[in-house]
């Protein structure tokens, strides 16, 4: 979202500048980082594998007025991922021109392989780059994002040309991480390559309580879909009140309350989870198709959850893995709704099946409610007693066991 201009165009120049900056910073870290075991330290220096990625893709797609499970969304994801990885390898080749390629580029034995299939990895590394480049032509043709596809093609041409001349400094450049809670610190509506969990969700806090999180991309999407400011205000107010953009039946009056959104625009706002008062959610195949749009342009794999409904069968789950394999995914993780006792993020206001005190009082008769309240007071008193009796916490410092490459070399020679 940070690279989307006010006129809706994607700022490729700033995006590529960010890619250059961070891939260079990650390359510098290889020689300044510490590693838990010697083999990881050695491999990190022989191949210099990095892991640049992005977050908030789902919000970017929604902001344009496209659904996550749409050809336009997949075209945008493919083009942006292609530019990111292609320019990372272009910068990798530029660093190789000055510093030399990674140690295993021309010497296959330096990785500790006694009898490698070939003395050098150079032709195989170039073959990998050529495969990435060939997939650019398979990005879906969408007029609105045609310029991004053209830029992706130019970027991979440059990465291949410079790599043939100089080799590559990092052997691996990109992966897609989940970005989890840190995504909230980056002001993201969505994490990694994920769609939004729900337009309104509730995060369970470690210290107790719930944090209500509203999707901030909805107004931008509605503007792109042609809604007036008054309509946008009414729709966002509906979402805030009912936790969904769908028409709902009011729980108090029993009357249908319309959100004001046109039926044909509902798929734009489909999310991973079904909202409390709604019926819509993304089909699990939509998750797989989005991953397949990005995977050909990544060095590594994608860490992403494929959300499946509670009604999913064993056959559905098997088919999901098989379909992911057929589409060339390197990894796949499935979450079946309600398969865990608790969840850090949910669409329920009370979270984890908990019920607010007033609601509980209304549902239970007076005698039952009083008994429950008495039991709660007893438990609170027991917790207070245990806290008072507990010993003060003692801080135990971890040993200095992590070493950089120089330390490993010194330890091995002594």
Please place each PLM-identified region on the residue numbering.
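Long, C-terminal-biased catalytic regions of enzyme "large/alpha" subunits
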Residues: 1-414
């Amino acid at each position: 979202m940070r690279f989307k201009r006010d006129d809706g165009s994607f700022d490729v120049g700033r995006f590529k500048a960010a890619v250059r900056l961070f891939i260079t910073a990650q390359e510098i870290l290889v020689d300044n980082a510490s590693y838990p075991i010697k083999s990881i330290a050695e491999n990190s220096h022989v191949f210099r594998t990095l892991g640049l990625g992005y977050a908030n893709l789902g919000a970017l797609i929604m902001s344009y007025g496209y659904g996550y499970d749409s050809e336009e969304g997949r075209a945008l994801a493919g083009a942006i991922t292609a530019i990111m990885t292609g320019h990372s390898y272009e910068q990798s080749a530029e660093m190789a021109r000055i510093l030399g390629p990674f140690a295993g580029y021309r010497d296959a034995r330096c990785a500790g392989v006694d009898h490698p299939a070939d003395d050098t990895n150079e032709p195989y590394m170039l073959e990998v780059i050529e495969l990435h480049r060939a997939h650019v032509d398979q990005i879906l043709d969408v007029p609105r994002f045609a310029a991004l596809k053209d830029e992706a093609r130019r970027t991979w041409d440059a990465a291949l040309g410079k790599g043939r001349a100089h080799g590559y400094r990092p052997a691996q450049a990109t992966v897609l991480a989940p970005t989890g809670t840190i995504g909230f610190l980056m002001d993201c509506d969505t994490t990694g390559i994920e769609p939004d969990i729900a337009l309104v969700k509730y995060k369970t806090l470690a210290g107790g309580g719930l944090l209500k999180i509203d999707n901030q991309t909805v107004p931008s999407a509605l503007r792109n879909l042609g809604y007036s400011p008054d309509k946008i205000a009414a729709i966002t107010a509906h979402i805030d009140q009912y936790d969904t953009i769908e028409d709902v039946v009011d729980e108090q009056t029993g009357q249908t309350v319309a959100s004001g959104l046109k039926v044909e625009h509902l798929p734009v706002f489909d999310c991973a989870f079904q909202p409390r008062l709604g019926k819509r959610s993304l089909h699990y195949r939509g998750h797989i198709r989005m991953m397949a749009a990005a995977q050909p342009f990544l060095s590594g794999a994608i860490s992403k959850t494929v959300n499946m409904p509670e009604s999913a069968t064993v056959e559905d789950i098997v088919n999901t893995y098989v379909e992911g394999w057929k589409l060339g995914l390197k990894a796949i993780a499935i979450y079946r709704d309600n398969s865990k006792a608790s969840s850090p993020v949910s669409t329920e206001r009370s979270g984890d099946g908990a019920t607010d005190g007033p609601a509980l009082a209304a549902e239970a008769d007076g005698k039952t409610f009083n008994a429950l309240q008495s039991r709660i007071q007893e438990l609170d008193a027991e917790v207070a007693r245990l806290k008072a009796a507990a010993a003060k916490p003692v801080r135990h410092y971890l040993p200095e066991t992590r070493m950089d490459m120089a330390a490993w070399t010194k330890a091995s020679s002594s």
